[in-house]
Amino acid sequence: MIIHPNFDPVAIHLGPLAVRWYGLMYLVGFIAAIVVGRIRLKLPYVAAQGWTAKDIDDMMFYGVLGTVLGGRLGYVLFYKADFYFSHPLDVFKVWEGGMSFHGGFLGVTLAMMLFAWQRKRHWLQVTDFVAPMVPLGLAAGRLGNFINGELWGRVTDPTAPWAMLFPGAMRDDAAWLPKHPELVEKWHLADVFMQYQMLPRHPSQLYEIALEGIALFFVLFLFARKPRPMGAISALFLIGYGLARFTVEFAREPDDFLGLLALGLSMGQWLSLPMILAGIAMMVWAYRRRAANAAA
């Protein structure tokens, strides 16, 4: 078993100010997006569409707003609506954590639609350009989660080479034991807990870095190297992210205030299903539209 390093959440101390790793990872993510965007400018078909470095800079401004506002509101509405409706001022306590990818995705989509309207472009042309820029930012965010020792995975067999002990999960581990006597006996978890006061878990943040971040980036980046029907790159992002997130959720610990929902699926899985279906529908539409235009 591997013990999580339990990093200091503060990366840099500047007198009374503290720069946290999670915030720093957001910065890394946005910088990575800019770098990928500038690399894409070198593709002939992208250059022919009139994209410029200034467009990327302006786009990032909209992207930051969409990510922060959408991510926060998505967390409030999708995950803890009852709490925040009772404590409305707590919505603004972003330093206490609480961001939702699916909310951030909707926020960025709306922000890109506004950007497209201002630049007189079709919004799918904008999202097709942006989609390959996103996954490395997602990977950076999940790395921030791992450094913080949060959003850990479900309890697993201690003999698994990837099993990890998370100090931040101690209270959850103690509460988990009496609820799962069969697994406690099967995996000899009582002995593990007696020795470490923790239980072995999946490092699901690392799985998300691998699938939602690195793998999805290469799939999108390679797919987008050639001209595709408008909407196809965006559709592949929806399908790829949705499938990656749906899969990893089987190893990720559900939010304790929600647990598992209908059919034993988590909130993250239920929110990913519409993404997958929308992506498939958009992909079919994109290629049929191109075929119809070619035949006209």
Curated annotation (Swiss-Prot):
GO cellular component: plasma membrane
PROSITE patterns from the UniProt entry: LGT (PS01311)
Key words of the record: Cell inner membrane, Cell membrane, Membrane, Transferase, Transmembrane, Transmembrane helix
GO molecular function, one term: phosphatidylglycerol-prolipoprotein diacylglyceryl transferase activity
Topology relative to the membrane: Multi-pass membrane protein
Biological processes per GO annotation: lipoprotein biosynthetic process
InterPro entries: Lgt (IPR001640)
Enzyme class: transferase
Subcellular location: Cell inner membrane
Domain of life: Bacteria
Transmembrane intervals: 17-37, 59-79, 97-117, 129-149, 204-224, 230-250, 257-277
Role noted for this protein: Catalyzes the transfer of the diacylglyceryl group from phosphatidylglycerol to the sulfhydryl group of the N-terminal cysteine of a prolipoprotein, the first step in the formation of mature lipoproteins.
PANTHER family: PHOSPHATIDYLGLYCEROL--PROLIPOPROTEIN DIACYLGLYCERYL TRANSFERASE, PROLIPOPROTEIN DIACYLGLYCERYL TRANSFERASE
UniProt name for this protein: Phosphatidylglycerol--prolipoprotein diacylglyceryl transferase
UniProt organism field: Burkholderia cenocepacia (strain HI2424)
